[in-house]
Amino acid sequence: MHFKPFVFALLILFITPAVFAQEADNNNKTSDTQLSEPSELQIFRKAFPDTTFTATYSERLEDWLITVSCPTTPITTANPATSSKRREITFCWCEGRLIPEAELKRKSHYLPVLEEYPFGGELQSPSTYTKAQIEEYRQAGLASARKNEPFASQFLSDFMYYGSSRKSVEQHLARIKFLGHKVTVNEFIIEPLARVEKRILEERKTSTTIDTFLKGIDHMDGYNWREIRDVERKSLHGTAIAIDFLPIKMNKYMYWRWTKDILGDKWMLASLKSRWMPPYEIINIFEEEGFIWGGKWLIWDNMHFEYRPELIEFYKQTHTEKQ
């Protein structure tokens, strides 16, 4: 009986440090998790400075929850306080897919939002394609592959640009004049397009190439609520963040599908000289202002530009890190 207090004291002496050690270990795990938010969030923050991306770790889902908060209407340079109202949504990070929790069971259908886009530079001549490259183009153009392959998640862009339904996006459209042509676009890309226009018109003063190109444009297409052929998903024209340049003379190849109808399986080998393309000076200006050009896709669409500043920022950050 006299030994019981002594034994109890010994137990406390040995058990207490173990408990504290375990507690410290748990705290370290929490701390590590808090410090390990997805690094790609910095890309989104830089691409969309008026939008906040807040990460909270979910033990239940074992994944990050990303709360996105953006203005209800565009905040412009001329009117920086245009809107103090904001809207919020929370996505699961899901390895960069940014999808609602309800879509987790279908996550294999989606690719990450951030995908490689070859910012800057010029196109490779088709005459130098390897057999592997030609096969890659051929596979990309197969209807079966295009319909069944996973695609980049659009839940973020649908939220930011009200693209989840035709009714919602049509409440945020504007008819503007761009490079002398009327076009309907999402109100959130009016200012980026204005920056593009200002730079192109300035370059036009000393560039006969740009002047000739602009004089050859018949009209432009912007908003069009429709699906992409063969894949049954909404085009970004449906979100109104894309525009197409349509020339007066349609005497060159400008879209892979139309080219395939003429050249068959050798559509990807159409020479650059035989393709209708904007001058690189114009392409570079668009890219520097956050737009990507469809002419750099495997299934190329040379008339097409769309506002994707996150892809431009993704290229800059990943390629800077590699240097």
Place the predicted regions along the sequence by residue.
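A generic secondary-structure signal for well-formed alpha-helical elements
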Residues: 14, 200-208, 289-290, 309
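Catalytic cores and adjacent binding grooves of peptidoglycan-active enzymes
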Residues: 32-51, 55-82, 87-93, 227-323
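Acidic, glycine-rich low-complexity/disordered segments
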Residues: 209-228
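Boundary at the C-terminal end of the N-terminal hydrophobic targeting segment
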Residues: 19-23
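Active-site acidic/histidine clusters and adjacent loop/turn architecture
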Residues: 144-213
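Bacterial N-terminal signal peptides that target proteins for export
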Residues: 1-7
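N-terminal accessory beta-strand-rich subdomains and adjacent acidic, glycine-rich linkers
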Residues: 32-165
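Bacterial N-terminal signal peptides
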Residues: 8-17
